[in-house]
UniProtKB/Swiss-Prot annotation:
Keyword Lipoprotein: yes
This protein's encoding gene: flgH
GO CC aspect terms: bacterial-type flagellum basal body, distal rod, L ring; cell outer membrane
Protein known as: Flagellar L-ring protein
Family: Belongs to the FlgH family.
Taxonomic superkingdom: Bacteria
Lipid-binding residues (covalent, N-palmitoyl cysteine): C17
Length: 234
């Protein structure tokens, strides 16, 4: 008995350590890269100089870049950045109900069963059975989400029709944790005004807002708890 008592404490410590490590942070929904390196541009020959109408534009490495004269500065190439104004507001509600009821009854008098003379044997024995089933179920759910802010995204690719595949991330450190805002989607260049576009105009948008501090870990259910919850019949 004493040997078993000495084993209880180590076993409890191991179980506590295992259960404490059961919480797993969910994987991000935005899986593609958050940024990309712009492609190398050809160097403009020294003989190509600015004139009265045409203006040759150079970057910090001396590489030439074409900018139309009568168009505003907006993202149009891989590696360019766009400001996305987050303005998401969704409301959803659902209410369901069902009702089912069934009843049955059966009676049997043995002396008259099939017209056979069983009266003297069973002494007027009667059989009777009844059954009744009733089911009533109701369900109701509602959701209300509101998300506002801004985030800068990077053009990852240009689709054949000219649309821009973008993705970006913003990290904010608050006290002992960090908040992550991730966004990816497809933007039509026509909707870009002053290099800004609304999130409601982003196609195939994936917006994710999460944290990695202790508050996020507390709100995450461990895999062992989810396992017992999935097999529980109650």
């Amino acid at each position: 008995m004493r040997n078993r008592g000495h084993l209880v404490l180590p076993v409890l410590i191991v179980m506590i350590c295992v259960v404490s490590g059961c919480a797993i942070t969910p994987t991000p929904k935005v899986q593609q890269p958050m940024s990309v390196r712009p492609p190398d541009l050809p160097v403009i020959p020294p003989s190509q100089t600015s004139g009265g109408i045409y203006q040759a534009v150079f970057d910090y490495q001396g590489r030439g870049r074409y900018i139309p004269l009568f168009e505003d500065r907006r993202a149009r190439s891989i590696g360019d950045t766009i400001i996305v104004a987050l303005n998401e507001k969704t409301n959803a509600s659902k209410k369901t109900g069902s009702n089912a009821q069934r009843a049955g009854e059966i009676g049997l008098s043995v002396p008259s069963f099939l017209g056979l003379p069983f009266k003297s044997i069973f002494q007027d024995l009667d059989l009777e059975a009844t059954s009744s089933n009733k089911f009533d179920g109701k369900g109701e759910s509602s959701s209300n989400n509101n998300f506002t802010g801004t985030i800068a995204v990077t053009v990852l690719d240009i689709l054949p029709n000219g649309n821009l595949l973008v993705s970006g991330e913003k990290q904010i450190g608050i006290n002992q944790g960090h908040e992550f805002i991730r966004l990816s989607g497809v933007i039509n260049p026509i909707n870009i005004i002053n290099n800004t576009v609304s999130s409601i105009q982003v196609a195939d948008a994936r917006i994710e807002y999460r944290g990695n501090g202790y508050l996020d870990e507390v709100q995450t259910m461990g895999w062992l708890s989810r396992f017992f919850l999935s097999i529980s019949p109650f």
